[in-house]
């Protein structure tokens, strides 16, 4: 009974960490990462479509992303979608492809991104605390329904807290690593 609650809690915590890692890919570091374009949606014949489903996206060097659409007619739509995504660069088109040139990041930009990383980490911790609350509520409900004793309930809540502490520490580590990566020149 309690093991099922622990497993559900761990699953919820893993989802929070996966979400945090996904959020981190949107932060720009010193070198270009094509994941910064993951949330760019292109108008493809009237329906919003992820950029990577209408074009090949590659990094050509440490500061440039090259986007080659599968249909040349999509260049204008891709450029518009990138501008609308507000990722901090203007697309340059040569008629065949779209290139994104990322200027070197300033110290202020790096510090701002580090703040964003910390805020993302806090959001993930809130998610984990919500998962902990749900798990504790389930343990207390079992005790109230006389399915477990008061001692088992206390042990169960202690285990829920240990799981929470473990995942909170993982988030702290991920945030510290991301901050170090962002602030590294």
Curated annotation (Swiss-Prot):
One of its GO terms (cellular component) is cytosol. It is found in: Cytoplasm. InterPro entries: Ribosome_recyc_fac, Ribosome_recyc_fac_dom, RRF_sf. Keywords: Cytoplasm, Protein biosynthesis. Its main location: cytoplasm. It holds the Pfam family RRF. This is Ribosome-recycling factor. It comes from Campylobacter concisus (strain 13826). The lineage of its organism: Bacteria, Pseudomonadati, Campylobacterota, Epsilonproteobacteria, Campylobacterales.
